[in-house]
Amino acid sequence: MENTAASNSRPRLAGLKVLVIDDSKTIRRTAETLLSKEGCEVYTAVDGFDALSKIADHQPDIVFVDIMMPRLDGYQTCSLIKHNKVFRSIPVIMLSSKDGLFDRARGRIVGSEHYLTKPFTKEELLGAIETHIVR
């Protein structure tokens, strides 16, 4: 029996454009490393303002955004994405060190599709992508 993963030399998420927004360099680098190994084109931003220009420039397929950031937090960033007619269809995954019901509900209210608690695993990160991206 042939191992399809081994026989397919192209990474499973090749060419998928992902934006990771987090004020933590460690989180940005971790996500970038994990996703790049899967073939994703990864863009990073340090806050919501930085992210908005990168969304316009790169038009990512999916966005991961930290909730607690300076200047423009994750809720505000998600809301701005979801209220823009050009970008509203981009799935937004909230990232937080908090795992409270209120935080999850507030994320849903502003339009996020999913919520991951930090620190996240490779499987959680890839699972969120596979759940929300139809390829």
Region roles according to the model:
Residues 1-17, 123-135:
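Non-catalytic signal-transmission and effector/linker regions of two-component phosphorelay proteins
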Residues 29-37:
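Charged docking surfaces used in two-component/phosphorelay signaling
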Residues 39-46, 54:
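Short hydrophobic/Thr-rich beta-strand motif most characteristic of the beta2 strand and flanking loop
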Residues 58-64:
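Active-site beta3 strand of CheY-like receiver
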Residues 69:
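Receiver (REC) domain active-site loop signature in two-component systems and cognate sites
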